[in-house]
Amino acid sequence: MSKAVIVSTARTPLAKSWKGAFNMTHGATLGGHAVQHAIARAGIDPAEVEDVLMGCANPEGATGANIARQIALRAGLPVTVSGATVNRFCSSGLQTIAMASQRIMAGEGEVYVAGGVESISCVQAFPSP
């Protein structure tokens, strides 16, 4: 059984204001920036990434349409790299890290990107029925 290790991390600034600089920045743009820099710091060829797994508590509206795939593309990964969005609400990002490590340990691949994304100001809190 292979061991899974985290070789790089990156995150975007955490904002507490609905009026902040990143207020209306799309989650895929923020996520793409973080993924691009995590891969660069790790010294990994982007083509080596098997899959991008992203947790998202509100995967609808601006963060819908498989935001993990959008992040992969905005991070500059090749179009051959797939993306999967996981919705487990508060534990979505942690779940993707567990899933990526399980896939590595099971021998299903070697390089995965896993994490979470949310741009809550771009998602309506209470959509109309």
Label the predicted regions:
Residues 14-40, 58-61, 84-98, 121, ...:
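Active-site pocket-shaping loop/turn-to-helix segments
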Residues 56-109, 122:
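Conserved catalytic cysteine-centered active-site region
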Residues 2, 105, 109-129:
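Flexible glycine-/small-residue-enriched beta->alpha junction loops
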Residues 1-16:
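N-terminal amphipathic/basic leader segments beginning at the initiator methionine
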Residues 11-13, 77-78, 119:
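Active-site/binding-pocket entry motifs
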Residues 37-50:
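Phosphate/pyrophosphate-binding loops at sites that engage ATP/ADP/AMP, CoA/4′-phosphopantetheine
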